[in-house]
Amino acid sequence: TIADLISYRINNDHIITRVYEEQISSDFGDNWKCIIYQNDLDKVEHVALVKGSINSNSEIPVRVHSINLFEDLVGVNPLRKGLIPKSMKEINKLENGVLIMVRDTNEGAISNLLKSQVNKESKGGNKLREYGVGAQILIDLGIKKMKLISDSNTIPLNLEGYDLEISSRHPLGDGK
């Protein structure tokens, strides 16, 4: 099955390495642990911001966010406006949780996004690879059971192959 293949690849093909950790404070709360991961295949760095403690037996609030230059920084998609600050505010309010920011560095990522905006198409992209990177970061952090922070009802692909479970959902809300 696909879950078996994913499980095999997770156990045999580790594609991320934890390269740096630092305690940080931000406009959205103090005492965040910032962990930098590097994808061993393309050397791209991804970020996990951890608030509070992680217990592998507990349900942990988690937001996995695919960073996009134009949507997150320029604001070309009003549906994604302010999602990173809202996520950090929500996790800070909960006093525990993780925000994972996965960078999309595929060739043509920016131009393909802009073309899909104009043509009103799904940008598709390399979601499977992004899920794999995010899942391996969650595993490295010791997370098994997640309270998914999201306003979307989309179900991520084959999480059981990663031995990850979405046990509940938590709306992102307005970030206040």
Please report, for each region that a protein language model flagged, where it lies by residue.
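Catalytic domains of riboflavin
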Residues: 2-176
